[in-house]
Design a protein with these regions (language model features):
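Substrate-binding cleft of carbohydrate-active enzyme catalytic domains
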Residues: 166-206
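Acidic, contiguous N-terminal accessory segments
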Residues: 2-168
Length: 206
């Protein structure tokens, strides 16, 4: 086998092999137009981009989604004002991030549409909205995960439409703390990072 050629483990040349080594250029998808992990099922780019300072409110349809809205809208530091006003009700036509219930969406799936006027997120329930907001965060500068969000108003997000749903129902990672110890805060941070990448199972070895 030549250097860099695909090599399947366990069942050579079987497309269902458990693991494959591939050439580095094969790993970078020619389809990737935005930096998102995991990459969505569909990404359609629009024209231009919009600054986050254009949006003044985050509208959510029901009280059970308020905490998701608060987490996205609020600064990480409690001493600062929310970046977006929170409103429960119908979607707004301008300057808003709208969470819109849509029963046609797949379980845990969502549609995220960014235009010059609004960011509309459609999902059939809490999980879909959660994953859509994670994707929206990934479209922003990495500073969105920092202790402050200085420059928020100037941050831009591309105009696009994303349609996505999980390829697998069980998406987990394992942490073995019986061999290498972690503090409670470190474990909580790991869970937060797992959520960024839309993992939904925490396998904990104690």
């Amino acid at each position: 086998i030549s250097l860099g050629a695909p090599l399947a483990l366990y069942y050579k040349n079987d497309p269902n092999a458990v693991m494959q080594f591939v050439k580095e250029e094969d790993m970078a998808s020619a389809q990737a137009q935005v930096k998102l992990i995991p990459y969505p099922q569909s990404v359609v780019m629009g024209e231009g981009e919009v600054a986050m300072g254009h949006f003044t409110s985050l509208v959510y349809p029901s009280e059970e989604l308020r905490d998701l809205a608060e987490t996205f809208a609020n600064h990480p530091t409690a001493s600062t004002q929310p970046l977006l006003a929170l409103e429960q009700g119908a979607p707004k036509a301008d300057a808003a991030i709208n969470l819109i219930l849509d029963n046609t969406q797949a379980d845990e799936g969502y549609e995220l549409k960014v235009t010059a006027n609004t960011i509309d997120i459609k999902a059939n329930g809490r999980a879909g909205f959660f994953y859509a907001l994670q994707s929206l965060r990934q479209l922003l500068p990495v500073a969105v995960y920092g202790a402050t969000r200085e420059g928020w108003a100037e941050w831009t997000v591309p105009c696009l439409t994303i349609k996505d749903r999980p390829a697998f129902g069980h998406r987990g990672f394992m942490l073995d703390v019986s061999r290498h110890f972690f503090t409670k805060e470190e474990v909580k941070k790991l869970i937060d990072v797992a959520a960024i990448y839309k993992l939904n199972r925490f396998h904990w070895h104690l």
